[in-house]
Amino acid sequence: MKIIHISDLHLNTYFKNSHLEEIKFILNFIAKENFDHLIISGDLTDNADSQDFEILRDLFKRKDLLRGDRLSLMIGNHDVYGGIVTPNDIFTFHEKCEKINYHLRLNEFYLYFFETFENCAYRNDYYPYAKKFGDLLIVAMNSVMPYSKVRNPFASNGSVNLEQYNEVIKILEEFSSVKRKLIFTHHHFNKIKSLRTGGLYNVWNNIEKQTIKLKKKKRLFNMLRKYNVDLVLHGHYHKSEEYYRKGIRFLNAGATIKDSPRKTIRINIIEISKEKISVDIKKLDLNSHRGVYYPVNKTITGPEYPRIILQ
């Protein structure tokens, strides 16, 4: 089975550098690949804006990806709380987060892409859910933590609450006979370093990097080892790499677009056979692999947001 893994698309059509061109390029490239399933591990949007979700839904539909057997999605912290769009947002972000209904945002994300949540072997509300493909089990585990002034002041920390943790265990026990087990979530499990450059935006990034930790990792490590999970996919930290921690294999797709060199795309390709799971982090030059893009017209529908219409 061939799985393509991408993450952190951060679509934001408020800005000229919206990542829309890169996302269309990625989907065109994927469409030409002989793949079985696509996994996107969170932060599909940058600011949780409704028009960005609508654009992504349309792009997925055009590529026949709005199907549970073709696409699995994870919500990211930016899909719930958004992020820092302008320098002034640094001073108003906390107030914005306090007004957001976490559970409502989970429901809205589900409704935008509800077709991809169908044909599950297990699903309770939104997360966790599981899909079974022959001798492969894919489990989706939500790590986005509700906003808290004390425990999650920048809405970027992660946590898997006890209820969901127990449900994941239930899934792994119910499908214990399945040979290959893959879990995907949004938050990373590795340690990261701070930026040394200056500037207000990078100061914010350094603050955020100190508050993007996945809490209570110890019990997650124990669970992953106990149930012999073969591979854990994630994003959040904008780096594409394969690594091991506590004897567990991880694959990050956080630099699919973000923090990659200009016009460079990174796509994780996973090949699963009876004998092994192989991983290839494919680097693509956007300029030398250009495909056919959808025509895009921009029209203004309000005082703040340009509306992008796909024809």
Identify the function of each model-found stretch.
Residues 1-58:
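N-terminal active-site segment of His-dependent metallophosphoesterases
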Residues 1-13, 135-149, 184, 249-255:
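Active-site-proximal beta-strand elements of phosphoester/diester hydrolases
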Residues 5-7, 38-43, 70-77, 142, ...:
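Active-site neighborhood of phospho(di)ester-bond hydrolases with catalytic His/Asp-centered motifs
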Residues 10-15, 45-50, 74-88, 127, ...:
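Active-site environment of divalent metal-dependent phosphoester hydrolases
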Residues 55-167, 175, 225, 269:
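Extended active-site neighborhood of metal-dependent phosphoesterases/phosphodiesterases
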Residues 61, 197-275:
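Conserved beta-sheet core of the metallophosphoesterase superfamily
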Residues 132, 240-311:
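Binuclear metal-dependent phosphoesterase catalytic core
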Residues 147-159, 175-228:
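Active-site-proximal segments of metal-dependent phosphoesterases and phosphodiesterases across multiple
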